[in-house]
């Protein structure tokens, strides 16, 4: 979590007597001494520093040791003059810049740096060797150094393609300069490292010297020079790419002088905290491996191995130091001095700097035998690369060639694909450019049509409610007139029935109320007025029949009393004119192109002829019937097929205008919507109009109105079979309206009075005339019902006409009628109302079941006529026999052959076969 600070196990040694003496001498002014001669013997402690200087600074003449009381001290501690000060000039020695430097800033969460920087470096006094031994060691060191230099040059030539960024070069020392290694050898080595570029040839020797500083004797405490050399070695390994630090924490030691790089510590910390967004530069070994095509896995494995090896070595060093050093600290100063004197006497020179006991460790076998058992050897990380063979290079090149061939093949396929895509795109462009002709005009036309349709719909959204109101008003006007006529007929029937029933029954009634609970005086007053009006209408109808010569064939009750008063006619016409006037003002503020069927049709015909596909895709053929619906309903506002002067809708302008819509030279499809334009309009406009007429205006008692309704219905069925059929919803609604109106008439308007036969004997009496009128009106209604044959089903008609009217009312009138010629005539008129198709396909000798009661009445009528003729004159018998033959013929006409044969056999009618065949 936090960065660990690298610890340097440097402990401060106890003060000795010699150090106290040296501090006393330093307080005294230094004497001015001449520079020592080259052949002068080194002082105490000087001999052991000279070899170290040679090992660190490279080969060359050994400089004379300074005259100092303590080994390792430079000119500042001794009496010599350092730098460029001449002897005897009296100048004070130059102070070190380290003393004036500020204490570096401590790292976060660590106080170790400040303690380590302020501690004094522990120095070990070493015993002097003799001059002879020193010379011998120098000679052997030079020989070993030359051998190592040759080896270094060979390694440098192998790595010549990757020059080192920074190379440590040793400084050539001149014996005459009098410069010696001071107490702070680290500072002077930093000063010499700044001149690396001036002396590049010395780098190999220095690298070789650093590579040998990898062994530390157990219990030995490294000094500043050793620590600095180790840091230089590690820095060099990092720069060469052969070593990766085993921890990611910033190093606490400084590779250069503290006075020159104090500010670099803070920069390093900032760099460690800063997120790196750039690509990390590869090491020189990795670059070389990539150039020759070797995979990076070997180099990664090598770096990982070196990291593990370095980590293991560092751990063992720390363990060894922790075990041995406390023993040194626990001893007395005198014992320590004795221990170090004995150690230096038995230890070969240079062992404290990582050199294996002597300078002969580089190639001498004697040096190997001098190692003790407690020395732990560590393998120096090698900077050499893995061997590269011809086969390896050939294999890598072959693999790379194969991969390039595969890549080339893929690129070639992509190239061909792009070429084909380019050709297809070119063709598509040409095709689109060729087909783009008229798109602008088409877009312009469609935009105009879009605006026109929007305006048309906005106009209709405002005008359609007005059209609906006018249509409702005209329907209400016709409904009121029809209801008034029906109500008048019902009142006349009630008046006559009340009048004749009171005469026949002579019932006692309340003085002020009639039989219906009405005010007698007021009712009688209104009844008198209605009777006068009714008789006046009948007189006018009789006069009209006399003028036309139809008086002889007319039967009372067959005519319809639909005459209106002048007041009603005037009011009706005024209201009708008002509605028509308002209808003419509906589109008076609208342009003709938005209400004229011809103009609207022309717009869509232009669209259809120019851009038929878009016209078809927009389903205009399905929208046109709904679009023309309000305009057609406005023209059909007063259209009523019940009137004699009603105009046929197929002769109107809107029908003629839309009749040839979409008819062009090209062949039309069967399922095209434009072909069904007029049938769809008939379905959506005409049928709903007829439904309203059937519910509110049609009178089933009126033969004329019924004939006209049947005529228009059959015309629609025959002329528009695709829409006017039993499966069509609007057709079903229309037929239901007709059927409901007939049922209502049957329940509300049919009335058959029952009088005793003695009352009906007087054929000029009011009850007889009223009875005859009601009978013939029922027969008339039966005929009107049966006019719908072919429209309604046989079952529906038989149920409505035979069961509901004939068997319920007419047969009851037959029972009260006189048996004779009048009954036969009435029966003949009833049978004439039946459709002949009912009896054509009957099998057997029996008629339809609903007519069984009527046939029995005819058989009973024949028997009654025969019984009445017994005992009469021959003329009466002959008339009775003719009536019986007529009854047999009537039975045969309704396919009641069983009853006809029975009557003929009972009454000895011999011409049965001729009567049946001549039916």
From Swiss-Prot:
Q: Tell me the residues on which Phosphoserine occurs.
A: 16, 160, 193, 264, 297, 559-560
Residue ranges with Low complexity bias: 49-59
Which region ranges are annotated with the description Disordered? 1-120, 151-206, 237-277, 533-566
Q: Which GO terms describe its molecular function?
A: DNA binding; histone methyltransferase binding
Covalent crosslink: Glycyl lysine isopeptide (Lys-Gly) (interchain with G-Cter in SUMO2):
151
Q: Where is the composition biased (Gly residues)?
A: 75-87
User: Where is this chain compositionally biased, Acidic residues type?
Assistant: 16-28, 185-195, 259-270
Q: Where is the composition biased (Basic and acidic residues)?
A: 163-174, 237-258
What does the sequence similarity comment in the record state about its family?
A: Belongs to the GCF family.
PANTHER family, A to Z = GC-RICH SEQUENCE DNA-BINDING FACTOR (PTHR12214), PAX3- AND PAX7-BINDING PROTEIN 1 (PTHR12214:SF2)
Q: What is this protein called?
A: PAX3- and PAX7-binding protein 1
Instruction: Tell me which species this is from.
Output: Mus musculus (Mouse)
